[in-house]
């Protein structure tokens, strides 16, 4: 199925909600395996649509993704194109270099490392992330399952991740650099209460989260990175969250990997720290 920008512009300029019902999306859950190849950022059409039509396009992409991930095998791979480099915010040659490095990894070793880490955490009801500046974030995991991304998920690969119990994440989380809406903020602390980001050490960051709908402020994911060929942070989340020795938390939607927080966005933030078992 082609998701070309020019075709999608024509479709969504006049599409109605009734065009994409459950029967339509149900077709995509019948495949055994799906390879989703990105030559450009899927939600960006390069063309202005009326707000209602753009909202329909976003909902379509979200619902399509939720169905595709139910297939037995689902992988997403980004081609090192100029369009994808532009999305990353990196110089095109630097983007290609970093992507090539992340792809050129020992996949068997990454899978073994991911499976070992997931086994260590399996069955834990609570974990803590300990960071610089004395910050500690505690997350409740009861009833939730660790998942691995080791070559058959999001490529470049290399992470394990879990959806914490949405209302039971508490504490402070520190980021040496927090990348947000194209800006880089240094030495940022986020305050999290009952699963929700409630404040920050930096006013601009606090204002950003305060302006979001509540569901987009909910901590929806924790994931340690496992790819040894990603060696430093660059602000491109797709790579940063895979870096071995880092962790990331995400806020917003997590229904696409079987959890409960339905939201319009999913944003990841990468830091350095240790994830440890509490119980």
Task: Show the residue positions of the predicted features.
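Active-site bordering "gate/hinge" segments
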Residues: 1-170
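Dual-mode signal for accessory low-complexity, basic/Gly-rich regions
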Residues: 183, 199-260
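Active-site lining segments that contact anionic ligands and/or coordinate catalytic metals
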Residues: 170, 185-187, 194, 217-221, ...
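Charged, compositionally biased interaction regions
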Residues: 33, 108-117, 125-129, 235-279
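A short secondary-structure junction signal
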Residues: 46-48, 85-90, 150-152, 184-188, ...
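Short, glycine-/Ser/Thr-/acidic-enriched flexible segments
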Residues: 40-42, 81, 134, 144, ...
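Oxyanion-binding "anion nests"
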Residues: 156-201
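Residues in well-ordered beta-strands of folded domains
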Residues: 36, 77, 130, 140, ...
